[in-house]
């Protein structure tokens, strides 16, 4: 779809840590996180931790783990590996990372996300657990592939979908690109569950604390723009936009005037422009 810039009255000071952009009043403060730059990391099922900051290949307990310079780690095996506690891939804010699971399924994790997964899947189900946002390209099999979260489970056989489940967000979403998925939602206020079937182009949005499930047609290109290195927002609240940008660049964002968070924007921009340039463009788009 085409994204249009539209004007809104926004007066703000954007604090970048390396300089100031002055507007009439102080409304929004944005500063780099004080945490040092972090790389993605693996925690293996025996507790061993591996920083994914360089190319490597290692044989470990019957597995071959390969990490590339392109930001992707894969798990390969030639024989059955004894079942054990799951592994965890952690992706800090300010970065992204890809993972190839033992069945060939590819997962791309957005900033501030974790995925818990086994070294080798069992014969009854392929189960992983997501916190944050992940883009899944699932290898087809008669064994179901299940992505679990405390508020939403997604069950597939082979398909492509995007799931967003950050613990601090009020909504969990699943957007389907290809195939078919069954989405089961778990209310956080009682023990009720709701299940719906998605076909390509549909998105399930669930508010776990309200128990509200909604299914709508969406622009899947917009919903998965982050996979192409883009920010794409169509009629999205500024508060939500700044939360996403904050995660992507490890920024702390504070709205001194809460009303600004509700202003809706239409913005499309490449992520590699850097946060300073992106913030300038957002200012132009909003006032």
Predicted regions mapped to residue ranges:
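A residue-level detector for the "anchor" residue at the start of short, highly conserved motifs
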Residues: 1-8, 18-287
